[in-house]
UniProtKB/Swiss-Prot annotation:
Region annotated Disordered, chain positions: 1-72, 113-155
Gene field: MBP
Name of this chain's protein: Myelin basic protein
Native source species: Leucoraja erinaceus (Little skate)
Entry function: This protein may function to maintain proper structure of myelin.
Coiled-coil residue spans: none
UniProt keywords, alphabetically: Acetylation, Cell membrane, Membrane, Phosphoprotein
């Protein structure tokens, strides 16, 4: 065959899976965002080559300082934060009595957040409803099983 098409030349040069990509779209996007000259290769002798070598370690060190002190994986870090007990916020000396009163109202006087729907400060030491008088959930279940109560089929 005497004449070859452009696709034949492309196949001969790089094969069917050429590593060279058509960067026309990328060039257009670069021009659009104004980064056309940001990837220029410096000519020999015009710009020192050590500039890029010196900049890489400094950026690496800056990123190392921002990392966590411990080398925990993100999963371990997540579970440590989830399983640790929640701490009440540190109360600083308030400038006015009003802001201190608001903080006490929100967090309660002993540093524990009040339950939703509780008026004033709730006593968390009382625990479950009916703990002393025997009207809790388990007590009511056992009372259902007493003889003479319940449905006639169970008597």
């Amino acid at each position: 065959m005497a004449s070859a098409t452009t696709s034949d030349h492309a196949k001969q040069a790089g094969g069917a899976h050429s590593r060279q990509r058509d960067s026309g779209l990328l060039d257009q996007l670069g021009k659009l965002f104004g980064q056309e000259g940001s990837r220029k290769v410096p000519e020999k002798g015009k710009e020192p080559a050590t500039r890029s070598v010196l900049m890489a370690p400094t950026t690496h060190k800056a990123h190392q300082g921002a990392r966590r002190q411990t080398d925990d994986s993100p999963v371990v870090h997540f579970f440590k934060n989830m399983m640790s007990p929640k701490k009440a916020p540190v109360q600083q000396k308030a400038k006015s009595g009003a802001s201190r009163a608001i903080t006490k109202f929100i967090w309660g006087t002993d540093g524990q957040r009040a339950h939703y729907g509780a008026a004033g400060s709730s006593k968390s030491k009382d625990g479950f409803r009916g703990r002393k008088d025997g009207s809790g959930t388990l007590s009511s279940f056992f009372k259902m099983g007493k003889k003479g109560e319940g449905s006639p089929a169970r008597r």
